[in-house]
Regions:
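Acidic/His/Gly-enriched intrinsically disordered linker/tail segments
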Residues: 30-179
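Juxtacatalytic substrate-recognition/specificity segment
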Residues: 1-32, 36, 49, 142-145
Length: 179
């Protein structure tokens, strides 16, 4: 067995990176469809070159892959820059079989935007996301761990914040009302 590898720069490695992200996740992190798939989509859409991920430039790549067909038409979700999404509470608690069902394209694209939001846009730092991830890894239920992301906000308030932050970045998400 060899000890070297070569990456063909002419090929898109996003699916491989997506699947490797799943392999590196704890089984507990996989209980939340949106988080599991969002994190994998986030990594798969982040530029990778020379053995490094470029997180500083990934927002434009993620937006392009979610709203269009990706930079250089390398593949994307093509949701457009204005789309309706499920109610946030329902989405964050969606069973995996439903997540990957008839609206899978929307669910995966939204998951990438949600991951980016919690990694870069939420609050003044990453405490909410870190606390959520620690809770999940320690065996806390998804519903309980979500309280750490909500941090006193209702799902409707969080949905509005996500909509506002993404609108400033050129993507208009419209979460359905949960009632």
């Amino acid at each position: 067995m060899g000890s070297t590898y070569v990456i063909d720069r002419d090929k898109d490695a996003s699916t491989l990176i997506h699947e490797l992200t799943h392999q590196l996740m704890s089984s507990q992190a996989k209980q939340a469809s949106w988080f599991c798939e969002g994190s994998a989509e986030y990594m798969g859409m982040t530029p990778y070159a020379g053995g490094r991920f470029n997180f500083g430039a990934n927002r434009s790549h993620i937006v392009s892959r979610v709203t269009e067909y990706g930079k250089k038409n390398t593949g994307g979700r093509a949701l457009g820059d204005d789309f309706e999404a499920p109610g946030l509470e329902a989405y964050m608690n969606m069973p995996y079989s439903q997540f990957t069902g008839e609206n899978a394209n929307l669910n995966y694209g939204l998951a990438a935007l949600m991951a980016y939001y919690f990694y870069h846009m939420d609050g003044k730092g990453d405490a909410r996301r870190k606390n959520y991830m620690k809770a999940i890894q320690s065996g806390t239920s998804e519903k309980e761990a979500q309280k750490l992301l909500l941090d006193g906000r209702s799902y409707e308030e969080l949905a509005k914040e996500i909509e506002q932050k993404w609108r400033k970045a050129g993507v208009k998400i419209r979460f359905r009302s949960s009632s």
